[in-house]
Amino acid sequence: MEPITIGLWVSAGMLAMVLLGMRVAFAAGLAGFIGIFWFFWDKFDYAADKIIYWNERREVWDGALGRAMQIAGSVPQSKVSANVLSLIPVFILIGYLAYHAKMTTALFEACKRWFGWVPGGLAVSTVFATAGFAAVSGASVATAAVFARIAIPEMLKVGYNKQFAAGVVAAGGTLASLIPPSAILVIYAIIVEQNVGTLLLAGFVPGAFSALVYAGIIIGMAVVFKTVGPPVGGYSWKERFESLPPALPIVAVVVILIFFVYNPFGDAWGTPTEGGAIGALIVFLMAMLKGMKWKQLKEALLETAKLTVMIF
């Protein structure tokens, strides 16, 4: 049997197990192990009608099972222990430090004042703010969790549909899967053995385009269904420009990371991990200057640890 056929059957089996209620991690692990065993059984042409004696059957079974267990035990460990994965907790820390230092709130406020006047303006502002936050966080869960606290109450306050508000935040959170420094792309780069920096950079344009598409869909829905997302007006040009300075720190971090890791004018100044470490230090210093308390720092570290453990 062709490996791709085995893969399709195993994927179908995993989907069936998930639909039957098994946890995704266990379903994926079991399906993967069965797929590896099946591959080696088929590779060495272990057909039942060719095996005459019981000891031959046992030898064949133990051989395929042994190879499957060996790979299942070594490959995940080798992938998870890759040094480049250390950038994931670093960028998650950047995101939570920015949140507890109120940088993300300032970013959302700036987006609200500039884009709130369009139909579904708060939802559009949420999408653009999540895109900006994704550029320093890299984790969809962190992005969705942060803006669920910031944006949903604001949208509900002006009469947004609850399901619509939650859907906007959930959709905005997915931008962190594309916009660098995406944790998903880091893991994918390790699996397919590609350069992490190059793959992260490749996600920037699709991520930015997705944000624009989301914004367009939101505006269209708000125009067709008037009560879904009413516009928010009343901001003067002075108020709009006044909202920019508080949002500059998080924008500055994004620019620094781009030039440090991806430098469009020459060679990169460092690796993504080094860029993340410098970004975390900069955000930490900014947070201290903005008056971050020990309790807030502790919460940022705990939330970073919890999300990192969940990802790994």
What are these regions (language model features)?
Residues 1-312:
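Alpha-helical transmembrane segments of multi-pass membrane transport proteins
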